[in-house]
UniProtKB/Swiss-Prot annotation:
PROSITE patterns: PPM_2 (PS51746)
Lineage: Eukaryota, Fungi, Dikarya, Ascomycota, Saccharomycotina
Consequence of gene loss (knockout): Decreased growth in non-fermentable sugar mediums. This is caused by a decrease in COQ6 levels, which results in a severe decrease in complex II, NADH-coenzyme Q dehydrogenase to complex III, and complex II to complex III activities in the electron transport chain. Impaired antioxidant defenses. Decreased phosphorylation of CAT5/COQ7. Increased phosphorylation of CIT1 and decreased citrate synthase activity.
Described purpose of this protein according to its UniProt entry: Protein phosphatase which positively regulates biosynthesis of the ubiquinone, coenzyme Q. Dephosphorylates and activates the ubiquinone biosynthesis protein CAT5/COQ7. Also dephosphorylates CIT1 on 'Ser-462', which leads to its activation.
Subcellular location per the Swiss-Prot or TrEMBL entry: Mitochondrion
Manner of cofactor binding, per the entry note: Binds 2 magnesium or manganese ions per subunit.
The protein's name in its UniProt record: Protein phosphatase 2C homolog 7, mitochondrial
Induction: By the presence of non-fermentable carbon sources and oxidative stress.
One function term, GO molecular function aspect: phosphoprotein phosphatase activity
Cofactor(s) for this UniProt protein: Mg(2+); Mn(2+)
Length: 343
């Protein structure tokens, strides 16, 4: 923690961040276009970091979900009734469990910048999670299709379905999906800046990496009409148009009592992994018998910090580095977590 004296307050939920740095236009919504092609390069594959655990027999998993949407009193949201009704805001999630030994889970975060242009930013993340839930359920019920049960393929199949069905007119979303199989070999596919972390004895032992084209501009799966693409081209801009093939893939061997967290950037923009470690250590007793209460308390704590104008959030510190000015304050955003415990 650093001293708050001399720090400008960060109020990202209300509009532009005012400062002397002219290249910083607005931090209130994430970007869905870029003036240049991404400079991010990824090998799209990450191997095991740990050898197989000693646990015998099939792994068992317990899950909990907690979320809190940000306040939607801005006029732009009043015009988007579906967005207001979404209980998770622009975030969405799914958890598919045919039995306690085989689980799929994921979160998706609709890119909020579209709301400023009159589009429901929650639509694409909601439809994507709905399709990922349907696909993972159908595949899990058919053991002969076990080879198809990869998170990356689930993202790809779901994205193809929502494009074909044309329910979503405009939007962009991140996506992270994890498979928790009976052998404990965690598989994760991530596209964008949502996050997965594995904690062992309250210490981080594995995490995914963010994919971005720039500050506050994540990789995203987008649906954009042709006329909007042409208009962007006339302006000399480019929308961020990723495909499921761009998702990074990870694998990691779990052990009994591991805690796994899938989270949208409402968490990681506010707190660091050190903070999560401290929270899990302070609430170790609840990880055994009160996973839902633990998850909700975690979200409540992050929400409180996101509304604190004096809190030195991760987001505020990044802005300080970019601008050379000292900013403080949490970043108000939708916050969603899926928490999994290995039993």
């Amino acid at each position: 923690m650093f001293a708050n004296v001399g720090f400008r307050t960060l109020r990202v939920s209300r509009g532009p961040l005012y400062g002397s740095c002219s290249q910083i236009i607005s931090f209130s919504k994430r970007t869905f276009y870029s003036s240049a092609k991404s400079g991010y390069q990824s090998n799209n594959s990450h191997g095991d970091a740990y050898s197989s655990g000693s646990q015998s027999g099939p792994f068992t998993y317990k899950t909990a979900v907690a979320f809190q949407p940000k306040d939607r009193d801005d006029l732009i949201y009043q015009k988007l009734k579906d967005s207001i009704r979404s209980p998770t805001g622009e975030d969405n999630y799914f958890v598919t469990s045919n039995n306690v030994h085989d689980i799929f889970a994921g979160v998706a975060d609709g890119v909020g910048g579209w709301a400023e242009h009159g589009y429901d930013s929650s639509a694409i993340s909601r439809e994507l999670c709905k399709k990922m839930d349907e696909i993972s359920t159908a595949l899990a019920e058919n053991s002969s299709k076990e080879t198809l049960l990869t998170p990356k393929k689930i993202i790809g199949a779901a994205y193809a379905k929502i494009r074909d069905e044309k329910v979503v007119k405009v939007g962009g979303t991140t996506a992270i999906v994890a498979h928790f199989p009976s052998n404990g070999k965690l598989e994760v596919a991530n596209l964008g800046d949502s996050w997965c972390g594995v904690f062992r004895d309250s210490k981080l032992v594995f995490q995914t990496k963010f994919q971005t084209v720039g500050f506050n501009a994540p990789y995203q799966l987008s649906i954009i009409p042709e006329e909007m693409l042409k208009e962007a081209e006339r302006r000399g801009s480019k929308y961020i148009l990723n495909t499921p093939r761009d998702a990074d893939e990870y694998s990691f061997q779990l052990k009994k009592k591991d805690i796994i967290i899938l989270a949208t950037d409402g968490v990681t923009d506010n707190i660091a992994t050190d903070d999560i470690e401290l929270f899990l250590k302070d609430n170790a007793a609840r990880t055994n018998d009160e996973l839902q209460l633990l998850s909700q308390k975690f979200v409540d704590n992050v929400v409180s910090l996101s509304k604190d104008p004096n809190y030195p959030s991760v987001f505020a510190q990044e802005i300080s580095k970019l601008t050379g000015k000292n900013y403080s304050g949490g970043k108000e955003d939708d916050i969603t977590v899926v928490v999994v415990r290995v039993d």
